[in-house]
């Protein structure tokens, strides 16, 4: 996701983004010519929110001196800019919708678990943390798509039973019924899929996803990151 506020964000991170806030306030620079923000977690603090920024999408700089951005957030961070210009992401413990107007100060509102748990009636069972929900706002339709992964076989002890589901909403109050997101054919017909991130570029929808099949089943793509259009 590209923003034109990275210069401002770099400065804000130095004083306002974690429990370990520095005293004082540095001069805030004017807006720059843009860049990319990467919201992520770490192995050491799984589910926590960290930021990195890049001018070119290749070379990255850790923000906030490598500290957690918001200690209350737990999830798989995937930030989208919504209908009102604000930024949104979903947390899972507790299940909540987080909103920010500046990517620094975040507020949360609870989400109903049944948004995801209704998929049980279709034979998909939500996993711990509701399968890493991600979201994207489509300006053309005025809808948010929320995706997550669930298992089609609760007795499986691996990732082979995972499938990605989705719901649509315009207001975070009413939601469509959960549906399976991908209907691939051929060798990928029964692909196990998790962590699907959806974006739209030049009128084309892209999904960055994780193929969770065992390499013995899918030698060329098993346990790899793939892109679908």
Question: Which ranges hold each PLM region?
Answer:
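Beta-rich carbohydrate-recognition and catalytic domains
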Residues: 23-130, 136-195, 199-229
């Amino acid at each position: 996701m590209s923003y034109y506020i990275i210069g401002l964000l770099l400065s804000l991170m130095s004083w306002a983004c974690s429990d370990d806030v520095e005293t004082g306030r540095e001069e805030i620079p004017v807006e720059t010519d843009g860049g990319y923000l990467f919201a992520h977690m770490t192995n050491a603090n799984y589910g926590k929110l960290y930021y990195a920024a890049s001018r070119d999408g290749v070379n990255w700089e850790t923000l906030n001196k490598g500290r957690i951005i918001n200690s209350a957030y737990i999830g798989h961070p995937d930030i989208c800019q919504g209908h009102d210009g604000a930024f949104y992401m979903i947390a899972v413990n507790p299940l909540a919708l987080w909103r920010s107007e500046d990517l620094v100060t975040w507020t949360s509102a609870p989400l109903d678990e049944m948004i995801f748990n209704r998929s049980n009636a279709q034979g998909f069972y939500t996993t711990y943390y509701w399968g890493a929900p991600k979201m994207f706002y489509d300006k053309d339709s005025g809808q948010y798509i929320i995706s997550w992964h669930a298992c089609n076989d609760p007795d499986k002890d691996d990732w082979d039973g995972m499938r990605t589901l989705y719901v649509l909403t315009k207001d975070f109050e009413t939601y469509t019924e959960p549906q399976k997101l991908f209907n691939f054919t051929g060798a990928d017909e029964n692909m196990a899929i998790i962590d699907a991130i959806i974006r739209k570029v030049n009128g084309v929808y892209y999904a960055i996803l994780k193929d969770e099949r065992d390499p013995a089943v899918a030698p060329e793509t098993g346990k790899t990151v793939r892109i679908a259009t």
